[in-house]
Amino acid sequence: CSNLSTCVLGKLSQDLHKLQTFPRTNTGAGVP
């Protein structure tokens, strides 16, 4: 990555997208 902040934001957005698209039936899995 050329820009660290861009990298971090990219990873965070990807993680958030995964959480949002994660099946709600598995509530508690990977959730604090």
From Swiss-Prot:
It comes from the Eukaryota. GO terms for molecular function: hormone activity. The modification Proline amide is found at residue 32. The keyword Disulfide bond applies. Keywords: Amidation, Disulfide bond, Hormone, Secreted. Pfam families: Calc_CGRP_IAPP. Disulfide bonds join 1-7. GO terms for cellular component: extracellular region. SMART domains: CALCITONIN. InterPro entries: Calcitonin, Calcitonin/adrenomedullin, Calcitonin_CS, Calcitonin_peptide-like. Coiled coil: none annotated. It is found in: Secreted. Its main location: secreted. Causes a rapid but short-lived drop in the level of calcium and phosphate in blood by promoting the incorporation of those ions in the bones. Belongs to the calcitonin family. This is Calcitonin-2. It comes from Oncorhynchus keta (Chum salmon).
